[in-house]
Amino acid sequence: SLNKPRDPRGYVMMKVLEDCDKAYERLPEAWGSGPLFHVSKNAALALKARAALFEGTFRKYHAGSEFVPQDEQVFEDKTISSTWFLQEAVNAAEKLIGKKALYTGNTMGIAGKATNASYREYFVLEVADPTETILARAYNSDDIVQVRHGIQFDYKNHKHSATTRFVNHYLKSDGKAYTETELATMSYYDSFKGRDPRMAQTIQGPGYIGIGDKAPEQLSMERTLNGYRVIKYIS
């Protein structure tokens, strides 16, 4: 009914997870052709894990506010809370993780193979790799289908750049965080040293070599607003 009162947030999110459960029950494990390009049981699990994680953390950190006046609630004889949602996220994630593994290849021979460039390569593969991929989109540039993306042009023409705040979230290679003092006195190139290796495979750093190129590319302010040029998805 159009005049029905709004359902409580917790009830709605409980139903979202129930829908994911129904999808998991009814969807196939894999499709006969192009399995990574169709919604499957794995996709349902991934969506449930993300939705439950978001709601669980939201309720945990907003409990007692106007958004979540009460953390623990009962709907249809089921008690929900931040803990309940987080456990649902764990259960869905564990079931999915057991079916997948991290991509570790370097089939494109991206420069920097010795330092493991698999993270950078994973996001520019011509064909989705089933090792880690849950759900992918098939692109085709022929004259009939023309399913394309233009993210490389967006990066170049609009100079999309990572913010300093975003960059500062990358931890050291040993898993520890930088102090405010360390970050304040660190040069641009020094900020990549001893850092989570995914940083240099997401943002252009020292020794960056474009795919298909042989020599390192110098940082150009024509492609970035602040020096932190994003290279993820660029092939």
Task: List each language-model region with its residue ranges.
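An aromatic- and glycine-enriched ligand-binding surface/loop that stacks and positions planar moieties
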Residues: M13, H38-N42, R50-T224
